[in-house]
Every structure is written in C-alpha cells, then in structure tokens.
Amino acid sequence: MARFIFITGGVVSSLGKGLASAALGALLQARGFSVRLRKLDPYLNVDPGTMSPFEHGEVFVTDDGAETDLDLGHYERFTGVPASKTDSISSGRIYTNVLEKERRGDYLGKTIQVIPHVTNEIKDFINIGEDDVDFMLCEIGGTVGDIEGLPFFEAIRQFSQDKARGQCIFMHLTLLPFIKASGELKTKPTQHSVKELRSIGLAPDILVCRSEGPIPEKEREKLALFCNVRPDSVIAAQDLSSIYTAPLAYHREGLDQAVLDAFGITPAPKPNLSIWEDVADRINNPEGVVKVAIVGKYTQLEDAYKSIAEALTHGGMANRVKVEIEWVDAETFEREDPAPHLQGFHAILVPGGFGERGTEGKIKAAEFARTRKVPYLGICLGMQMAVIEAARNLAQLDDAGSEEFDHEAGKKRFTPVVYHLKEWVQGNHKVERKVGDDKGGTMRLGAYDAVLTEGSRVAEAYGTTAIEERHRHRYEVDTKYRDALEEKGLIFSGMSPDGALPEIVEVKDHPWFIGVQFHPELKSKPFEPHPLFRDFVRAAKENSRLV
C-alpha cells in the first residue's frame, strides 16, 4: 500500500514544485523505493491539448496518448517511470466526469455538489494504483489561496483523514525573498502562506523554501517555530546552475531523510546516487561547446519547447559538451536571406508547431541546413518543412505546401505534399478523422511503432530497425511524392508498419540531416539520452571542428 506525499505551493507560482517532486522521486528511487508521480491542475480546461504554448508551455504526450502538463516531463526525465493518463487531471476533467455521471443517473437523483461529489472524484483519481508502488507523489498545481484550487485542497484534506495515520504527509514549497537593501531573507511570506494552508485544514510536515542562497540557522529556526515544523524539515531549495544537480542538492539538504522521518521509516535504506553523480559530472565538466539554433514559432517562451531543450542537454551529456541554444524566430527571415541569422551555428533544429505563421522561415532554415551541410533535426512540423523544401527545390514542385495552410486560409494555394490525416491504424483498429472535428484529443496521439530501413542513418542511431515513438499530429507527408523525392536524395527511411505513413526522412550525401514525424524529445532522459539527440549533438560537435 502506497504512502502519499502531497506537494503544494505558496507565495508565488513557478517556484519549481514539479522539479522538487521529480527530484524527491529520484531520491526515493535511489533508496530502493518504487514511486509514481501525479499532477492535479485546477484550471478548467479538460487538458492542455488545446491551450496556446504561450499560455501553458509545451504539451507533454504520454505513451497512451494523454496530453498533459510539462511537469510530467520532469517526472519521467528524473525517475524513468513512464507517465500515463492516470497521472494527470484537471478541474475540467473532474467536472466533466461528475456531470457525465449525473447525466447517466449514477448519483440516483441527488443534488450534485462540490462536497462530496467533486472531492470524491478527486480522491478516486488519487487512489488509482495505490497498491502498485511504495510512494505516490501528488503535486497540486497553482498556489494555496487560489479559488480554483480549493476543491483539490479539500479533497487531499479528506483523503489524509480517510487513510491510516502516518500514511500521508504534506510538503509545502514557498519563496524566501532576499531584500538587498537590508541583506536579509524574509520569512513573513512563507509564514502567511502556511497560515493560509492551515486555515483550510492542512498542516505542512516539510517546508521547502526557494531562495537564492542557503538559509541561515536563525531564519531556519524562525520558520520551524512559526510554521510548526521541525528545524530539520525546513529545506533550502537554492538556485542551481542545472536542474539535474537538484537530486544531489536536495539530498545534501536532507529532503529525502526528512520525508522518511515524517513517515517513521527506520532504519532508512542508504541511497545509491552514483547515477546522479555521473550526471552532475557531465553537466559541470564539459569538454567543449556546440551552438544549436532552434528555429521556431514560440521562441519568446522557452517552456514551449521544454523537452527539446532538455533532450539537447542530454545529448550534450552523452558527448561531453555543453549545448548552447539560440532561440531564432522563424518569422525574422521569412522574406529575406536566412544566412545572417543562421551562420555560425553548429546545428539547426526545427521543432513542431501549428499554423502557417513562420513556416516559410522554417523552410528556408531547412534549405540552409541542406545546402550548407549543417546538421539538421526536424521534428513533426520540422520534418514536414524539410519535405516541402525538398519538393520545391529538388523535385521542382514549386507550389508544394501543406493542406494545413490551405485550411487556415480557406482557399487552395498549394500542391499538398503534406495532407490532413483522415485515418490510421492504432493497435488492432482503424481511427478515422475529418476536417471540422473538435480540436481536443483528436490528433494522432501517443506511442506508435515504426520500421526503419536497414543501413539508414536512423537505423544506425537506434541500433535496430523496429522502434516505438510518441506522436502528436494531424497532418502527414503524402507517400505519392515519395519516388520523386527519393530520386532527388530525400530518403524515406522510416515508415509505419503498414507502410502507409512516413515517419522519418533523411538526406542522402549529407553529414546529418534527419526529419521525424514523432517527438523523440519526450523519451529522452539525462541518464539515457535519446539516440537521435545523442547523434545530432555528436554531428554538431564534429561540425564545430570544421566551422
């Protein structure tokens, strides 16, 4: 039976609850325990799948096709435990479930209320799989005091009462601001945050305090006194140069020991942190630097491409180099020469995205990489842009484009080498879609198999010809142009098992030019870099010696 750790936040948002949860999960694993991490988001969207990247950051897709919060990416990267649909939920999904049950008559005519019906739905979600792991870590999104979060805070209060004494603990993450004028860390915001938490029936067992530096003993004792926690349960979460040193930093602060003490687990198994020591060594001691341009649409918000940035870091670790990322707005050279914007980079990556804005710039970036022999990785839309570029400039199909852009404009302007995907095979059944369907949850989502061409660069990278990768797209490259493109050197080196859907293209006689329809960044980890990112950074490293 699992022990439950509820992670809440106060004072301000974006303090790093997700990272703290992920790091704690990794530390518990290092002591031999099994863990599962969950995110409960109070927003009213059913899931983040239709939210703007500027609003929410990236959407993290699981093997079973759930569109989830980017924090689940941190959970997977730090613990290696694949997330699923049962690891992410929102108020929107909770209320949808409750209302569907009411329509079916499941509540037998009762008046539907937040308590008990909504809170029971939340508790039922938390309980899923409780017998499968030693520890269940549940992060509540937002901050204490948010109106949207009240049903979740009430639900976890009830949940802790429903369970046996000592089966649940609460970890509260707050901010300790440093006032330069007085040279002091201020504890008052944390005291008020804990006061707010206690007013709704929750008392923290552990305080994790985000700060620029260490917490002096005087302030630690003050927090312990006024927030009613043990001094050794006041944990400093200091600013770090890399998130991947967080497990070691939290261990030095005693977070994992404080958790085990709160549960009364003695003697505590000793941790094996060798994996994280190796990760920290690779991060802190690079043997070179490579510069990678990410040519995208949402470059003003780096969280929109969070997993890509992390996967590049993992590729750098594998090659003992630091990857310096430059965010390049694809719109800046839609109507001008891309060379001044892209010269000097050792590799170019074009990520996924939606809509026509910026696509001509991405096509130019693909052309620049192909003609200048610069390593190129195109992901999802980035692969489609590479195919359109090759169709226009190699296969003489001057008006090559995507149906997506025609649908957006409301008129036909392009020969669609990329078309709206209307059917595909998922497991043992066929999925059908049409233009005009609801946006939410209707893409080709989750893990799908692909078959690679023997002797291809991608088969060499993976070390096999059978792979499984995660997808999130509704447009696909049309195979009827395959022969014409392969004749000109754009090889279709990966296909769906039925041969209907192109999964990977690569350019013949190029140092490293690969486009993939899937999202390899979603499966990369610091201790297990994805083979495509490993080899992409290796190619950038080789190119750095030539530039």
Curated annotation (Swiss-Prot):
Keywords: ATP-binding, Glutamine amidotransferase, Ligase, Magnesium, Metal-binding, Nucleotide-binding, Pyrimidine biosynthesis. CTP binds at S13, D146, I147, E148, K186, T187, K188, P189, T190, Q191, K222. Residues 1-265 are annotated as: Amidoligase domain. Its EC number is 6.3.4.2. Mg(2+) binds at D71, E139. Pathway: Pyrimidine metabolism; CTP biosynthesis via de novo pathway; CTP from UDP: step 2/2. PANTHER family: CTP SYNTHASE, CTP SYNTHASE-RELATED. This is CTP synthase. It comes from Jannaschia sp. (strain CCS1). The lineage of its organism: Bacteria, Pseudomonadati, Pseudomonadota, Alphaproteobacteria, Rhodobacterales.
